[in-house]
Amino acid sequence: MKGSLRTAEGSRAAGAGGGRLRRGVKALVSTGDAVLLIREQHDDGSTFWTLPGGGLRDSEHPVAGLRRELREELGAEIVVDGPTDRVWYAHHSRGRTLSSYRVYDCAVASSVDPNPAEGTLDARWVPADELPPRTLPQVRSLLERHPELPT
C-alpha cells in the first residue's frame, strides 16, 4: 500500500494522515427472531450498542480472535458459519484510528453472560427493526444491508 507503514501491532498506518488501521472481528448472531447486541461504554461515559467482538491480536486468525472475544465479553462459545460483511469504525477515543471489522455469521452454543470487567455492560436479543437508541450507525447500516435477518 503506497504511503503506508507497519505499526508495532502489525496493522497498516496511513502515511499522510498519520492514522492507524486496526483489524478486528464482529459476530452477527441471530436466533431467527432477534440479533445479539452488547452495550459498551465510550471513554466519556456515554454508552452504545454494538455487535460482540473486538480487535485482533498480532498474527491472530480472525475466527480464533472472534471466539476469544466472545468468551471474554460474554462467556459464550460460538459456532462460526463464515464471513458475511465488513464494517468500519473511526475511534475518536483511540486517537486517529480506523478499525476494519470483518463480520461473521455465528450461532451461540452456550449461555450469554455479559462481563463488565471486559467492558460489556449488557447483552440483549433485539429484533433488527427494534434497535435500541444509541445503536452504532455502522451496526444499523449492516443490518439494513442484510434484510434476511429477523425483524
Regions inferred by a protein language model and the residue ranges of each:
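Acidic, metal-coordinating catalytic segment for phosphate/diphosphate chemistry
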Residues: M1-K26
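A generic structural micro-feature
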Residues: G17-L21, F48, R94-S100, A117-T120
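Conserved Nudix-box catalytic region and its N-terminal flanking loop in Nudix hydrolases
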Residues: S30, A34-E72, A76
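A short coil-to-beta-strand element that immediately follows conserved catalytic motifs
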Residues: E77-R86
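Active-site-adjacent beta-strand/loop module that shapes the phosphate/pyrophosphate-binding cleft
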Residues: V87-D113
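NUDIX/MutT-family hydrolases
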Residues: R102-D105, P114-P147
